């Protein structure tokens, strides 16, 4: 029986690691990618021992030109046919766009726009030829909320949502299913919250555990869902927040001093 392979980016911790574990539990061999060299090697050993699968851990910076082609070429050289591509790698910062450092802006654009697009392009071509494959792109609930402080982040995630929906239409007739996931807050180290606050947020339904999100995401992918906004709290609150006038949002941001806004 031919081995099934999945590729997960940003897989050294958090949601990416949860995706890797979920796919490993379903019998997939793994290519896992991260810009944290020691962590990705350790996670590779951990996953291989726990699930009895073959794991190729790759130390790569996906926020630079040519990263996607290099990753694709590595899989080709090692004769690894990717059946499942999970574009999970990402970054987050909270500040006014023009206050961010230029290199950080460029890094986010590569990580959220250029590299995932190119990975879909290269691996999508192989899937199209085989007439079988799955692509899961990670957008965000914030793609509907381009507010001060997260303007660039929300906009790049909006791109991923739109790109995924269009690519899905192009590939469905070739047996390739593209799903976009738009999660809200997830209990990872991204927000620098204490464990007690994370636990409270999970109980209130404001946050979701990465393992739960990964299971929902992979289930949606294999059920050929176009998109998924997981969590009852997110489904209820997102439409309400979208109704807020931008003038009110600016006033809240200015009053709370979350970001510095010019009058």
Predicted feature locations:
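Conserved glycine-rich Rossmann-like NAD(P)H-binding loop of the short-chain dehydrogenase/reductase
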Residues: 26-42
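Active-site helix of classical SDR
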Residues: 120, 156
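SDR active-site lid
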Residues: 170-232
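Conserved NAD(P)H cofactor-binding loop of Rossmann-fold oxidoreductase domains
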Residues: 88-93
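Conserved glycine-rich cofactor-binding loop
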Residues: 5, 10-13
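Residue(s) in the substrate-gating loop at a strand-loop-helix junction
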Residues: 140
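Substrate-binding pocket helix/loop in short-chain dehydrogenase/reductase
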Residues: 96-97, 101-109
């Amino acid at each position: 029986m031919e081995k099934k392979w999945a590729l997960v980016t940003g897989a050294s911790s958090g949601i990416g690691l949860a995706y890797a574990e979920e796919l490993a539990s379903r019998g997939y061999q793994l290519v896992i990618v991260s810009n944290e060299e020691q962590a990705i090697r350790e996670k590779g050993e951990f996953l291989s021992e726990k699930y009895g699968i073959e794991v190729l851990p790759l130390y790569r910076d996906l926020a630079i030109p040519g990263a996607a082609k290099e990753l694709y070429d590595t899989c080709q050289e090692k004769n690894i046919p990717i059946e499942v591509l999970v574009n999970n790698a990402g970054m987050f910062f909270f500040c006014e766009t023009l206050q961010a450092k230029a290199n950080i802006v460029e890094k986010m654009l590569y990580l959220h726009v250029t590299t995932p697009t190119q990975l879909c392009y290269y691996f999508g071509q192989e899937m199209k030829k085989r007439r079988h494959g799955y692509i899961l792109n990670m957008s965000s609930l914030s793609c509907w909320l381009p507010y001060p402080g997260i303007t660039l982040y929300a906009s790049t995630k909006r791109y991923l949502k739109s790109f995924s929906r269009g690519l899905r239409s192009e590939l469905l007739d070739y047996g390739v299913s593209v799903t976009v996931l738009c999660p809200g807050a997830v209990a990872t180290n991204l927000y620098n919250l204490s464990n007690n606050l994370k636990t409270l947020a999970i109980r209130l339904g404001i946050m979701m555990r990465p393992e739960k999100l990964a299971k929902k995401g992979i289930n949606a992918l294999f059920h050929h869902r176009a998109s998924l906004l997981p969590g009852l709290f997110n489904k209820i609150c997102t439409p309400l927040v979208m109704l807020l006038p931008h003038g009110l949002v600016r006033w809240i941001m200015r009053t709370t001093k979350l970001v510095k806004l010019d009058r």
